[in-house]
């Protein structure tokens, strides 16, 4: 069913199936068209989670938010390009990108025409700052944009907290963080496990 034609009633005592009040507030602040585009790089080792047969699994994470903005548009773009999260190692990784793509298509019975070439995807969007990994782009009609990342490990999909933070960037101005250096202050790149740099590492950039 299309979200705008669905009714919701959370019967759980703690509203377990409903996003937090903060998440609801953020969704209500988006008063124009919201488009969520999933970019899937076939050469990314996480790509299987973004293939068409898994779209419903990805929608499961977004659906509680779509309840509060049912006119949200969902789009999927499939491409192949170099990535810092490649499926391949060794000799295969040194093959031309198109040959890597064709190998995966042959192994997984996929249509090569389904995937945009690097040149074609570059005309749409530049994802190099994100390592050309699989990612969501959240975009408002007013031009504000925000990336929502997938993660390494067993549980790669963003959850409610990460989704809320990404949506919040569409309705609030980013805070500026300033670091003072040169007077004996602890370095931003201090490597202690409890230091900021360690936290940055653990949170994936």
Task: State each model region's role.
Residues 1-205:
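Short, surface-exposed patches at the edges or C-terminal ends of soluble domains, predominantly
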